[in-house]
């Protein structure tokens, strides 16, 4: 299942995502992974959370990003949750191909029983209808 924290840039999506990670660490039985566009939040995350700076992996388009996520999932059978901060940037995704990418990520998450929680810099009204039930928070 995918879950989305949406809102315009600067509305506090990252804080909500980090708070969610902090709570999840206390209850998690498996692995947690946090993907971001930098290492900026390294010291805000528990050492039980794997921080991945996506800019270090030469991802140049959304198809490569989906493959990257597939690789993460395939290498950790205990993976519970993947957190994606600044989703549009780290996934190299635009509004034009957003639906395709979200559907692929949703299919992956359901097939391998991994929750994917992401922050998306878009208003709730801009998001596609098929994700309306996947919105965790709208700012």
Residue ranges and their predicted role:
Residues 1-71, 127-130:
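Conserved P-loop
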């Amino acid at each position: 299942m995918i879950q989305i924290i949406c809102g315009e840039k600067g509305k506090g999506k990252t804080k909500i995502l980090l708070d969610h990670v902090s709570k999840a660490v206390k209850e998690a039985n498996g692995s947690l992974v946090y993907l971001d566009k930098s290492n900026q939040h390294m010291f805000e995350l528990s050492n039980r959370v794997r921080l991945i700076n996506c800019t270090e992996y030469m991802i140049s388009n959304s198809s490569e990003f989906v493959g990257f996520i597939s690789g993460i999932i395939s290498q950790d059978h205990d993976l519970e949750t993947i957190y994606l901060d600044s989703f549009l940037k780290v996934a190299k995704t635009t509004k034009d191909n957003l639906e395709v990418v979200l559907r692929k990520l949703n299919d992956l998450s359901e097939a391998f029983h991994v929750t994917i929680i992401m922050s998306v810099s878009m208003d709730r009204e801009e998001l596609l209808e098929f994700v309306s039930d996947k919105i965790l928070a709208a700012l």
